[in-house]
């Protein structure tokens, strides 16, 4: 689940970051403000919003999707959507300042020499934002691994199907017995270790000028 969430955030994070920085259009400021919405509302609210839209026959789109055999709520797709939504701003907020900093001079020069938009992005823009993108992806991964509220609402916590590591921690911690407590703390420690290790590795690999 975390893998798919990070993949979605990588693609959408770059695209949404470019829109308000490189293009002028009505509603550009509104888009910039909406980027922070997932950080401003409770993850529980995010989960309830997804229920409102995709829940079975009562959701706005749930009945239509179920008619074609696609289940969103209480299934992996809903969990991926919830996790991607709450962690997307972490990617965008790393990339946007770098795009402002590098400006558009090199991109305009490349286009004046005949480079296509795709070539310009691949050879100029992407290399310039690569460390910001990587750091944002790592933050997104850490957030995805630790997400609890939104996932709990949309997943149902079905063991071996929609139960994430964070939901397992909660379930085992609330159960009696030394073994369950040890399992809960072990899973929590592993999640925290993965997040910390990923951040340390990326920070260590960053060029010194990128760290300043």
Residue ranges, per PLM feature:
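Membrane-helix interface segments
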Residues: 23-31, 60, 75, 117, ...
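Transmembrane alpha-helices
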Residues: 37, 85-87, 91-99, 103, ...
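Transmembrane alpha-helices and adjacent helix-loop boundaries
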Residues: 39-47
């Amino acid at each position: 689940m975390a893998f798919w969430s990070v993949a979605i955030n990588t693609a959408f994070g770059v695209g949404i970051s470019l829109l308000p920085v490189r293009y002028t259009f009505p509603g550009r400021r509104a888009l910039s403000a909406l980027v922070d919405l997932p950080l401003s509302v409770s993850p529980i609210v995010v989960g309830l919003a997804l229920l409102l839209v995709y829940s079975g026959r009562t959701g706005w789109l749930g009945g239509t999707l179920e008619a074609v055999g696609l289940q969103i709520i209480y299934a992996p797709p809903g969990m991926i959507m919830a996790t991607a939504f709450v962690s997307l701003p972490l990617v965008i907020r790393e990339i946007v300042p770098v795009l402002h900093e590098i400006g558009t001079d090199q991109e305009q020069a490349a286009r004046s020499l005949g480079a296509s938009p795709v070539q310009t992005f691949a050879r100029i823009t992407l290399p310039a934002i690569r460390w910001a993108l990587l750091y944002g992806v790592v933050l997104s991964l850490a957030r995805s691994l630790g997400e609890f509220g939104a996932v709990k609402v949309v997943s149902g916590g079905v063991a071996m199907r929609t139960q994430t590591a964070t939901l397992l921690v909660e379930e085992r911690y609330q159960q009696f017995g030394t073994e369950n407590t040890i399992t809960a703390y072990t899973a929590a420690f592993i999640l925290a270790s993965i997040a910390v290790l990923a951040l340390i590795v990326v920070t260590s690999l960053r060029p010194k000028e990128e760290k300043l």
